[in-house]
Amino acid sequence: MKMINQDTICAIATAQGGAIGIIRVSGPKAIEITSRIFTPATGKPLTERAPYTLTFGKICSPKRKINNTLFQQTSEIPQEKSETLQKTSSITSSAEEVIDEVLISLFRAPHSYTGEDSTEIMCHGSSYILQQVIQLLIYNGCRAALPGEYTQRAFLNGKMDLSQAEAVADLIASSSASTHRLAMSQMRGGFSKELSNLRNQLLHFTSLMELELDFSDHEELEFANRDELSSLATHIEQVIARLAHSFSVGNAIKNGIPVAIIGETNAGKSTLLNALLNEEKAIVSDIHGTTRDVIEDTINLQGVTFRFIDTAGIRQTNDTIENLGIERTFQKMDQAYVILWMIDSTDAQRRFEELKADILPHCEGKKMIILFNKSDLLLATQKEELSAIFADMKVEKLFISAKKRENITILEKKLVQAAALPEVNQNDIIITNVRHYEALTRALDSIHRVQEGLQLELSGDLVSEDLRQCIHELSEIVAEGGITSEETLQNIFQNFCIGK
């Protein structure tokens, strides 16, 4: 295992306001520094205790020091008072202030989360107590940890690869059963093992092809069988394409299934968003064009996270800013998984055919629900007329009143049915990380070029160059071969919380 020389760090690992607080200490002097401020209730000092043990005791501040200048001017103080103050000084200077009674867990390198000597101090959750303990640790030689520094040290010390480290952040942020399963799957290393296996096979062929270059004078020599390499490239192409394709599902699970609420101005889109979120998220007004930019928020419905997007109303306008908002509406429609088309049922103009021409090109391959809003103001015959106009569209349709929350519960059920994402278990390998997706896309381009080079019977040095590029992209995901830049690592770990 690769160990790195570092200082010793400390941080509060638990959220404020809980009954129990935990402080993590990690580094070469973690046990020594912790023992300086900790007095065990019984037995050996902390430095002599075995790993994976819990020790009960107390955290104490250093002995108090009295300013001796107070007693230098004894001639100005009556003799009896001077003696009393000196006795008080003697008592105070020998006493220790107990901060809290605590439990301390002990881990010795390399068998800890970070791969370093580590302690975890479990105390009462008072913010005062936690800050006092942190100050004592820093006074005795610790440094306050940076965001994500514990997991970064675990990565640098070989306890996990980079994709597993990123999964830690996903696990912390998981808000549903599906996001939890995906994070756990990545943390267990299934994704990393599959990539490492592909990478090693490519390395084998690359080394054989480069060996041929050393014997370029003997053109008849062929160490790397081209048919076997072509079969391998086809297999790798299929695996990478499957992983990259899974990103659309993984991203929807992780960040919420994107649902675009679209329609004309004043159709009730913002009112619907507020009804779904059960809060006044968007401004509602009778003035046309009130929403000029997209408004997004998430909500969990029956265990499924949805990301609702309230968009600018679609209409002809000369307002430059409003037109920019309408352009973004179409962009969000292209990105959405589900589209809610809001229609003002009371609109006498009824320019539905024109709207269809604008909207439908952005809806191909997407789930759509047509919502006839303000249906509480319609007669039964009017509802029949509306249904007839849209009879040619084989999509879900629902009459609602966003303002009165009529049929909102039914809409929520239809949304869950429309989402219909595949069931996820901890053995599934599904991509949720944009960085991974982009690297896989580049790797796919490289393996395409390898296939083309083999078909065109290009020289081994040209084919091996594309092989090396594919290896590089796969290595970038898990940081094998030490090729990941310091900037990439910083961008990843700075998004972690302090204490993790």
Swiss-Prot record:
GO biological process, one term: tRNA wobble uridine modification
CDD domains referenced in this protein's UniProt entry, alphabetically: trmE (cd04164), TrmE_N (cd14858)
Residues where K(+) binds: N266, S285, I287, T290
Gene3D superfamilies per the UniProt record, alphabetical: P-loop containing nucleotide triphosphate hydrolases, Probable tRNA modification gtpase trme, domain 1, tRNA modification GTPase MnmE domain 2
Pfam families in alphabetical order: MMR_HSR1, MnmE_helical, TrmE_N
Compartment list: Cytoplasm
Chain ranges of the TrmE-type G domain: 256-420
A GO term for molecular function: GTPase activity
Co-factor: note: Binds 1 potassium ion per subunit.
Primary role: Exhibits a very high intrinsic GTPase hydrolysis rate. Involved in the addition of a carboxymethylaminomethyl (cmnm) group at the wobble position (U34) of certain tRNAs, forming tRNA-cmnm(5)s(2)U34.
Protein family (similarity comment): Belongs to the TRAFAC class TrmE-Era-EngA-EngB-Septin-like GTPase superfamily. TrmE GTPase family.
This protein's name: tRNA modification GTPase MnmE
Originating species: Phocaeicola vulgatus (strain ATCC 8482 / DSM 1447 / JCM 5826 / CCUG 4940 / NBRC 14291 / NCTC 11154) (Bacteroides vulgatus)
Gene that this sequence comes from: mnmE
